[in-house]
C-alpha cells in the first residue's frame, strides 16, 4: 500500500467463502481404492471320494481373510480457487523462508556473530507470523495472475482475492475482532492506467478490466498484525512490457541497496539508486517515445504491528533524507513508474479509510458516527479498510457518519492517487525484514 509523500499523509500514523473445497487425495473420486477385496473361497476336491466314498464328503479349505488396508491420503494441496488454510498445508507451523541475503561490508559480522544469532532465534514467532502471511500472499497472487482476464469486473477480481486471503489465513472477519487476528492487511487495490494507487471498487461499481489496461494489484495479508505488503502490475499487451520491467528492476534495485548496506543505510541513498534505474528505461507507445519517470511523491514505508504506515518513508527519488534503517524494522520497498508527469494527485471516488492511531478525543454529536466508530474499533482497529468491508458486516446508511469521522480527524480517508489522464503507471513492491543476522525479502516468490 503506497505511502504518499505529502504533508497531509506524512503526519499519519496508520497503523464468504464461496464453495469451500478441501484438498483431496491424489486421485479424487476413488474412495477405498486401496481396499483389498476378500479372496474367493478355494474349494479343494475330496481326496478320497473316488476310492472309498467316505461319508464325511469333501474336505474344504478354510477361508483366508486378509485384513482390509486403506490407501493413505496424499499430501494436502491448495485448491482452485484457494480455500485451504496454509496452516493445514504446513501442519508443523514452520513456513518457507523468504529470500535470505547476508549483510555485507561493515555489517558482515552480523551473519556469524553469536549475540546476533541468539537475537535471531528469539524472533522465531515473529518471523513465522510474517512467513505465514507471505505464503498466503504468494498462493493467492499465483492464482490471481493465472486467472485475471480482461472482461472481468474489478469487483469480481477484488472480492476473489480478498475471499482467498481470508480463507488461507483462516479468518473470515465476520465476527468482532476476527479480522484483527488475521486476514486482509488492507483492501485489495486495483488501480488502472493513470491511477497509481488506493483504488478499489465501492459497492455498485461496474468497471470492467479491458485488454489495453495496465492494472496495479496491491494487497496485504496479515497474521496477528504482521502485515505482508506486496504488489505487482498486470498488462495484456506486450507494448507495456518496458514499463513493467523498469519498475520491477527499480524495486529490485532498492532491495539491492539494502543488500549492500541494510541496517544503517540512509533513505536518500536508496531513493537515488531507484531513480537512476527507473530513468534508464523508456517506452514507445503509438509511435511516441516516453521516458519512464519515478512518481516522486509516492514512497515505500516501514510497517509496524497492525500499522501499515509506521512513520518512516523510503523515497524513490534522490533527496536529502538522512533517516537510517534500523535492526528489527520491517519495510515495504515499493516503486512506481509513469509515462506521465511522475507526480500524482488525489482524484476519483474514495474507497480506502483507516482509523488514525492516537487520534485526539473529539466529541461526536451524530449517533451514526458513534455507532460506526464502535464497529471500526472492534473489527479493524488501526488496519485500513474500505466501504465494501462495512457492507460485508451489514452496515448501511453509514456515509453521513463516516464523513463526520473523517472531518473530525478520527478516520483518515485515502483517495485514489492519479497521474495525468492518458498516462500509464506501474508498481512492484516487496516486504523486507531486517533481521539481526541477515535480511529477508519475506514476500519474494518465483513470480517477482
From Swiss-Prot:
HAMAP family: MetAP_2_euk. GO terms for biological process: proteolysis. Pfam families: Peptidase_M24. GO terms for cellular component: cytoplasm. Binds 2 divalent metal cations per subunit. Has a high-affinity and a low affinity metal-binding site. The true nature of the physiological cofactor is under debate. The enzyme is active with cobalt, zinc, manganese or divalent iron ions. Most likely, methionine aminopeptidases function as mononuclear Fe(2+)-metalloproteases under physiological conditions, and the catalytically relevant metal-binding site has been assigned to the histidine-containing high-affinity site. Residues 22-33, 47-58, 75-88 have a biased composition (Low complexity). It comes from the Eukaryota. It is an enzyme of class 3 (hydrolase). GO terms for molecular function: aminopeptidase activity; initiator methionyl aminopeptidase activity; metal ion binding; metalloaminopeptidase activity; metalloexopeptidase activity. This is Methionine aminopeptidase 2-1. The lineage of its organism: Eukaryota, Fungi, Dikarya, Ascomycota, Pezizomycotina. CDD domains: MetAP2. Keywords: Aminopeptidase, Cytoplasm, Hydrolase, Metal-binding, Protease. Belongs to the peptidase M24A family. Methionine aminopeptidase eukaryotic type 2 subfamily. Its EC number is 3.4.11.18. Its cofactor is Co(2+); Zn(2+); Mn(2+); Fe(2+). A divalent metal cation 1 binds at residues 218, 229, 429. Cotranslationally removes the N-terminal methionine from nascent proteins. The N-terminal methionine is often cleaved when the second residue in the primary sequence is small and uncharged (Met-Ala-, Cys, Gly, Pro, Ser, Thr, or Val). A divalent metal cation 2 binds at residues 229, 301, 334, 429. Residues 34-46 have a biased composition (Acidic residues). It catalyses: Release of N-terminal amino acids, preferentially methionine, from peptides and arylamides. PROSITE patterns: MAP_2. Disulfide bonds: none annotated. Substrate binds at residues 198, 309. Residues 59-74 have a biased composition (Basic residues). It is found in: Cytoplasm. It comes from Emericella nidulans (strain FGSC A4 / ATCC 38163 / CBS 112.46 / NRRL 194 / M139) (Aspergillus nidulans). Residues 1-90 are annotated as: Disordered.
Amino acid at each position: 500500500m503506497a505511502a504518499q509523500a505529502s504533508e497531509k499523509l506524512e503526519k499519519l500514523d496508520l497503523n464468504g467463502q464461496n464453495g469451500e473445497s478441501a484438498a483431496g487425495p491424489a486421485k479424487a473420486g476413488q474412495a477405498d481404492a486401496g481396499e483389498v477385496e476378500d479372496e474367493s473361497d478355494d474349494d479343494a476336491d475330496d481326496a478320497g471320494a473316488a476310492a472309498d466314498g467316505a461319508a464325511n464328503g469333501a474336505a474344504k479349505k478354510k477361508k483366508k481373510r486378509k485384513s482390509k488396508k486403506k490407501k493413505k491420503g496424499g499430501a494436502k494441496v491448495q485448491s482452485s480457487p484457494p480455500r485451504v488454510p496454509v496452516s493445514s498445508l504446513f501442519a508443523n507451523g514452520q513456513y518457507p523462508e523468504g529470500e535470505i541475503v547476508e549483510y555485507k561490508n561493515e555489517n558482515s559480522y552480523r551473519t556469524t556473530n553469536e549475540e546476533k544469532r541468539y537475537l535471531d532465534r528469539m524472533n522465531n514467532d515473529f518471523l513465522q507470523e510474517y512467513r505465514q502471511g507471505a505464503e498466503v500472499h504468494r498462493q493467492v497472487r499465483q492464482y490471481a495472475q493465472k486467472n485475471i482476464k480482461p472482461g472481468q469486473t474489478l469487483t469480481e477480481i477484488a472480492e476473489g482475492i480478498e475471499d482467498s486471503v481470508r480463507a488461507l489465513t483462516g479468518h473470515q472477519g465476520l465476527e468482532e475482532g476476527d479480522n484483527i487476528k488475521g486476514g486482509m492487511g488492507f483492501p485489495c487495490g486495483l488501480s488502472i492506467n493513470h491511477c497509481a494507487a488506493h483504488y478499489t471498487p465501492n459497492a455498485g461499481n461496474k468497471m470492467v478490466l479491458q485488454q489495453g489496461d495496465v492494472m496495479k494489484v496491491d494487497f496485504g495479508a496479515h497474521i496477528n498484525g504482521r502485515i505482508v505488503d506486496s504488489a505487482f502490475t498486470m498488462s495484456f499487451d506486450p507494448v507495456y512490457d518496458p514499463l513493467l520491467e523498469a519498475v520491477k528492476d527499480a524495486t529490485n534495485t532498492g532491495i539491492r541497496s539494502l543488500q549492500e548496506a541494510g541496517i544503517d543505510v540512509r533513505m536518500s541513498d536508496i531513493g537515488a539508486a531507484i531513480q537512476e534505474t527507473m530513468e534508464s528505461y523508456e517506452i514507445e507507445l503509438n509511435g511516441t517515445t516516453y521516458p519512464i519517470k519515478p512518481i516522486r511523491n509516492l514512497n515505500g514505508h516501514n510497517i509496524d504491528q497492525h500499522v501499515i504506515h509506521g512513520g518512516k518513508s523510503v523515497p524513490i527519488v534522490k533527496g536529502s533524507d538522512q533517516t537510517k534503517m534500523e535492526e528489527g524494522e520491517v519495510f515495504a520497498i515499493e516503486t512506481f513508474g509513469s509515462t506521465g508527469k511522475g507526480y500524482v494527485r488525489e482524484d476519483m471516488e474514495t474507497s480506502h479509510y483507516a482509523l488514525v492511531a492516537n487520534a485526539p478525543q473529539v466529541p461526536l454529536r451524530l449517533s451514526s458516527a458513534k455507532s460506526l466508530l464502535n464497529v471500526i474499533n472492534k473489527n479493524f482497529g488501526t488496519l485500513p479498510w474500505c466501504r465494501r468491508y462495512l457492507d460485508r458486516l451489514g452496515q448501511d446508511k453509514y456515509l453521513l457518519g463516516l464523513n463526520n469521522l473523517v472531518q473530525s480527524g478520527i478516520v483518515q480517508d485515502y483517495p485514489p492517487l492519479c497521474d495525468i489522464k492518458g498516462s500509464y503507471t506501474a508498481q512492484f513492491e516487496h516486504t523486507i525484514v531486517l533481521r539481526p543476522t541477515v535480511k529477508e525479502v519475506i514476500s519474494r516468490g518465483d513470480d517477482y
